[in-house]
């Protein structure tokens, strides 16, 4: 029985390791993006701190924005908006629950290539208890901080797809340059009489 349990555990480990499964909160950042510049209008803001923390957790070395290196990809954080909509109401018509939506836009500039826009949305529910105003404010601040962390995780998770899009655009450019003939094809301008 002990050997069977060991065999099943070993098989489970091999299957999860072989299929590319990774632990949560770890992203395979492409090797070309292991050194990056983080550019933000508010470098000490909550989103910048959360993104900087996620990049460091994923083994990305961050360079100063004023660096002289121009061959390094740059993650530029854009606008952040937080909206709050009523999700449910009490019998008396007061708001009982809010749905908060955080929208974050950013772009990745790969030198000599292109600018790739990325965006993410994070949704959270927030219960509004009118009898506990102070606790409500503290809870809302905690939820917003958590939303910044989740948005940063989602932005970092999109970095491999940007690398894939960059490779795909390179392949398309090489195929269009090899497929075009050396002399332009003759185009008829008559209406086919």
UniProtKB/Swiss-Prot annotation:
A lipid is attached at residue 19 (S-diacylglycerol cysteine). Gene3D superfamilies: Lipoprotein like domain. A lipid is attached at residue 19 (N-palmitoyl cysteine). PROSITE patterns: PROKAR_LIPOPROTEIN (PS51257). GO terms for cellular component: cell outer membrane; transporter complex. Transmembrane segments: none annotated. Residues 166-193 are annotated as: Disordered. It is a lipid-anchor. Component of the lipopolysaccharide transport and assembly complex. Interacts with LptD. Together with LptD, is involved in the assembly of lipopolysaccharide (LPS) at the surface of the outer membrane. Required for the proper assembly of LptD. Binds LPS and may serve as the LPS recognition site at the outer membrane. This is LPS-assembly lipoprotein LptE. It comes from Escherichia coli O157:H7.
């Amino acid at each position: 029985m002990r050997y069977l349990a060991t065999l099943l555990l070993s098989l489970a480990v091999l299957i999860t390791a072989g299929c590319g499964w990774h632990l949560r909160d770890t992203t395979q950042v492409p090797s070309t993006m292991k050194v990056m510049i983080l550019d933000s209008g508010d470098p000490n803001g909550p989103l910048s701190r959360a993104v900087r923390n996620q990049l460091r957790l994923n083994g990305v070395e961050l360079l100063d924005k004023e660096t002289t290196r121009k061959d390094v990809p740059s993650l530029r954080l854009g606008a952040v908006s937080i909206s709050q909509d009523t999700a449910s109401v009490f019998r008396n018509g007061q708001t009982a629950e809010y749905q908060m939506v955080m929208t974050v836009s950013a772009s990745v500039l790969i030198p000599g290539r292109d600018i790739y826009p990325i965006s993410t949305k994070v949704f959270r529910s927030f219960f509004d208890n009118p009898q506990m105003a102070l606790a409500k404010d503290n809870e809302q601040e905690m939820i917003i901080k958590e939303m910044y962390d989740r948005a940063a995780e989602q932005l970092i998770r999109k970095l491999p797809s940007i690398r894939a899009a960059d490779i795909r655009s390179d392949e398309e450019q090489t195929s269009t340059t090899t497929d075009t003939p050396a002399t332009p094809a003759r185009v008829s301008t008559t209406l086919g009489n």
